[in-house]
Amino acid sequence: MSYIQGESRQQQSLFPPTLDDFVPADHVCRVIEAFVDKLDMGGLGFQRAEPADTGRPGYDPRDLLKLYLYGYLHQVRSSRRLEAECRRNVEVMWLLGRLSPDYKSIAEFRRMHSEAVTKAGAELVRMARQVGLVRGEWVAIGGSKFRAVSSAGAVGEREAVRRYLDQMNGADEQDEVTIDPSAVAAAIEKLNSDPEPEARFMRMSSGHAPAYNVQTAVDAAYGIIVAHEVTTEATDNRSLLPMAEAAKRALDNPEMLNVVADAGYSNGEQAERCEEQGIVPHAPANRSINNQGDGTLFDRSLFIYDEKTDTFRCPANRMLTRKRVMKHKKTVQYAASAADCSQCPLKPQCTTAERRLLKRHLHDAALQRMNARATAQAMRLRRCTVERPFALLKYVIFGHPRFLLRGLCGAQAEVSLATMAYNLKTMMSVLGVTKLKQELA
């Protein structure tokens, strides 16, 4: 018995197979081609959407976008690896018509078209709406940290330089010390030469590291990412309104949109502005812990607020009146009478100060409404909707949650390509390749 034998490398064929014979009818490449060929590249902002009349011909941006979508769908993000795929991968040969762009052309396309790629992703969301995969009734918002290109040492050194310059500015204003102009000039030059000035230290599962905060808004029907944004904010408490507005725009501005998020998005002012625009936020209020007497004294929740009189009632039925408005903290401070507190038998359980003080957020009513809507069912919907896409983006599409491009613009381009790849995967899993291809045609 012999082994199964392959054909001789010198064997000629009377009817040579075409590239199309190597790509099945239900292959993802055919979906990518149907989607990209339907795009108005010029309208989306892609350069060289129409060939120039003079000069050396360039690559069609459609071909390079197809290449990147294929790469992100197969965990190939590097421009050099994509260049290699063009020469050895039959599927890529079919997709690009045997074109073999060099890695510089591939990398330059991604670097230059961050905004255009984001608009192309919005077109895919619009197509998903047309085929019924986006309902626009409930949207879950979430954020996750992705490592930046810069090392921790580089970002730490940059922060040290900034602190040094701040100290020099303070010393200059006070005229206390003699400042070396050459040292300041060297520090400024080093700061200006930083290749990734936007990266910030953020807390991640592996500790603090230079990172960006990736925000997504996911439709609850089938898990389509309808909006995304890359920010330099280490926390999420200022992202509720911008992400909710972005989701509403992507859904063609419905009259009412339910948005669910975790306690990290707790922001009374933004919740109120959401309600003014027909956006109904559902998120737990992220109140500070009770640190009165190491947690042994009366918590703020035991004090009852009267909206008509704008006062609080303490557990001893005494009144706390408005004292002042702290605009920079967006809070109102209330204080009990020192005379009432001095005679109160509950004072040892209430405060160690002369009198008890309380703070109330200026937009506390909106915060309370948002908190009341954050039911167990709504929080379960949030977990099931927004957590899975991040897992797929980080470990299936990216491979590891670290960017290849420096800067906020580069990170946005990568996330836009990754979310397009994720949405294509989701649409194919729901509709199937054949039906999706027909819908996109």
Put a short name on every predicted segment.
Residues 1-19:
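Short, flexible loop/hinge motifs at secondary-structure junctions
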Residues 3, 50-55, 374-377:
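A ubiquitous short alpha-helical element
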Residues 5-6, 68, 75-88, 97-441:
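Anion-binding and metal-coordination hotspots
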Residues 13, 64-65, 122:
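A generic alpha-helix surface/boundary motif
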Residues 22:
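C-terminal catalytic core of Y-nucleophile DNA break-rejoin enzymes
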Residues 25-69, 74, 362:
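Basic, short loop/linker segments at the boundary and entry of helix-turn-helix/winged-helix-like folds
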